[in-house]
């Protein structure tokens, strides 16, 4: 799973869908 923390996301890997969706 991914978790957004302000200006970045963390999660299982760098290609987490939440990070893609948010432009990270």
From Swiss-Prot:
Organism the protein comes from: Ctenus ornatus
Pfam families with a match to the protein in the record: Toxin_34
Key words of the record: Calcium channel impairing toxin, Disulfide bond, Ion channel impairing toxin, Neurotoxin, Secreted, Toxin, Voltage-gated calcium channel impairing toxin
Cellular compartments per GO CC: extracellular region
Record's function text: Omega-agatoxins are antagonists of voltage-gated calcium channels (Cav).
A single MF term (Gene Ontology): toxin activity
Subcellular locations according to the entry: Secreted
Post-translational modification: Disulfide bonds are present.
Domain of life: Eukaryota
Identification of the protein by name: U4-ctenitoxin-Co1b
Tissue expression profile of the protein: Expressed by the venom gland.
InterPro entries recorded: Toxin_34
Family assignment from sequence similarity: Belongs to the neurotoxin 04 (omega-agtx) family. 03 (type II/III omega-agtx) subfamily.
